[in-house]
Amino acid sequence: MIVTTTPNIEGKRIVRYCGVIAGEAILGANIFKDLSAGIRDIVGGRSGTYERELEKARAIALEELQQHAVALGANAVVGIDLDYETFGKANGMLMVSVSGTAVVVE
């Protein structure tokens, strides 16, 4: 399945719009506790542990998005937008959300 941030796909023609779809993943507070305990992971101002968890959450959100697209009969998703939001007590939760338009391309 093609998933892209662009509104169209070069060399492909959109023949049907199936609808707006979304996928989400939420990281619980325990990841932030683990991160503060694992400060030694930080190299050059970056935390490898945190980045790996974000990558996992992003992959989960994108997989959920694609599952919704397939359920609508789409073979591509265009115009995707990834967002990251913190919430909860002391911003202890992180949500990764992705949305886009499910389409059929030829």
UniProtKB/Swiss-Prot annotation:
Q: Which InterPro entries does the UniProt record give? A: UPF0145_dom_sf (IPR035439), UPF0145_YbjQ-like (IPR002765)
- Cited SUPFAM superfamilies: YbjQ-like
What is the name listed in the Swiss-Prot or TrEMBL entry for this protein?
UPF0145 protein VC_A0951
Q: Which organism is this entry from? A: Vibrio cholerae serotype O1 (strain ATCC 39315 / El Tor Inaba N16961)
Gene3D superfamilies in the record, alphabetically? Hypothetical protein apc22750. Chain B
Q: A Pfam family this protein belongs to?
A: YbjQ_1
Family note = Belongs to the UPF0145 family.
